[in-house]
Amino acid sequence: MDATAFHPSLWGDFFVKYEPPTAPKRGHMTQRAELLKEEVRKTLKAAANQIKNALDLIITLQRLGLDHHYENEISELLRFVYSSSDYDDKDLYVVSLRFYLLRKHGHRVSSDVFMSFKDEEGNFVVDDTKCLLSLYNAAYLMTHGEKVLDEAITFTRRQLEALLLDPLEPALADEVYLTLQTPLFRRLRILEAVNYIPIYGKEAGRNEAILELAKLNFNLAQLIYCEELKEVTLWWKQLNVETNLSFIRDRIVECHFWMTGACCEPRYSLSRVIATKMTALITVLDDMMDTYSTTEEAMLLAEAIYRWEENAAELLPGYMKHFYLYLLKTIDSCGGELGPNRSFRTFYLKEMLKVFVRGSSQEIKWRNENYVPKTISEHLEHSGPTVGAFQVACSSFVGMGDNITKESFEWLLTYPELVKSLMNIARLLNDTASTKREQTAGHHVSTVQCYMLKHGTTMDEACEKIKELTEDSWKDMMELYLTPTEHPKLVAQTIVDFARTADYMYKETDGFTFSHTIKDMIAKLFVDPISLF
């Protein structure tokens, strides 16, 4: 792709000066939110006596982005739900919601519970919209071989699509539309909160304290996000992209949006900042090596990154030198931000960058030799690491707490199967979104083109096959997510969150490269507060 085809930044210096209109009310909002948190906590404790009420409350708190305030209470409640048989197993809504929440929290529950909702011919018998939505969302937490969940998706999708042809209550119509667009488990948690708050506000049975807390919680988080955006924008400006690197994708705000989609809780501010910088640096590396540089220049840059020392800059062409030195300076400064007990983690940032350039070098070799990988598996082995999902997910752990240990970082660098499933999802989604653009731009063959050439299919047929492989990778991820490891559950949860961001960014097109497609959602997340009235 000609570098000039990348559109310029849509945001420029906007966030350097921007403050949301709620900023002067921060103190009052914080005090009010603390009072409401305790009121909602009492409601949560009172729900423990009735499983259906408990499940309804948990899913509401999750969708409104409030569950991180009640992690211990929710975990305790779900342990009770898991061990109790005191619920109506003839109520499909309850059975589906129980299945969804337990699997989402890592409990391995059987999908056989849905067999009783079929008739003698093996067809589902459901006509209630709320039950259809609950079953559809539950079915997307499937692993391989769960035929009943595959059948549930086919059945419920057909029913829900038919429902949209008839008038529905506004809140229910919104729910059906959102669900068909993206099942609940795959939605970005912070965007789900933004979208669900107005829907919940229309529900007759809403809890006013929960609704008010959700609005305050989002507006307070937005203030933190905007502070981070100012910091990373000022950092980015020092690269002087418009003059020195005019050929790259200038997407610092989109990088932060990506990281916020995966790690939205306020306590992960440092994590978001470090991961945003890492994502932006990887974007520069990708555009240099994949789009702009000659093969010789790209190999020189790779060698400099392997060496990781200032004097290696002398080997580089002029346009690379400043970037390379700024890269080294940025990673070193991360060590200072982390403090003495966690500064060792910068070693892993360096290693992740080396993994990226190693994979990019292999892709350049393929392109120059017109080599087509023999199988999709061979392709993914080399192209998975260059999609960047592994690097940005791991870099987010660098800024997290001490529960992410050195052993966890060492484990991540071995490419465990959970990480591979993330890389596969991101690569396959990226390829289906961008293959038509890249096919005409002299890139190495994508997984889509690889399949076309090996099987003699059209591009549309190949894209459908790649979508099937993407779904298989989601099943891989779910199986691995349910498998206990010695590492904190936060690691697996965050990796799943990064798969969700890939799904969002590449669902219809390459939303990162062509970021006008996500501009409105960025504004909803970072610019527009939610009205409290």
UniProtKB/Swiss-Prot annotation:
One term of GO molecular function: terpene synthase activity
Taxonomic path: Eukaryota, Viridiplantae, Streptophyta, Embryophyta, Tracheophyta
EC top class named in words: lyase
Domain statement: The Asp-Asp-Xaa-Xaa-Asp/Glu (DDXXD/E) motif is important for the catalytic activity, presumably through binding to Mg(2+).
Pfam families xref list: Terpene_synth, Terpene_synth_C
Protein name per its UniProtKB record: (E)-beta-farnesene synthase
EC number(s) recorded for this UniProt protein: 4.2.3.47
Cofactor names: Mg(2+); Co(2+); Mn(2+)
Residue numbers binding Mg(2+) 3: N430, S434, E438
Keywords recorded for this protein, A-Z: Cytoplasm, Lyase, Magnesium, Manganese, Metal-binding, Plant defense
PANTHER family noted in UniProt: (E)-BETA-FARNESENE SYNTHASE (PTHR31225:SF118), OS04G0344100 PROTEIN-RELATED (PTHR31225)
CDD domains registered for this protein in UniProt: Terpene_cyclase_plant_C1
Residues that hold Mg(2+) 2 according to the record: D286, D290
Function, in words: Sesquiterpene cyclase catalyzing the production of sixfold more beta-farnesene than alpha-bergamotene from farnesyl diphosphate. Involved in indirect defense by producing volatile signals attracting natural enemies of herbivores.
A GO term from the CC aspect: cytoplasm
Motif range (DDXXD motif): 286-290
Biological pathway: Secondary metabolite biosynthesis; terpenoid biosynthesis
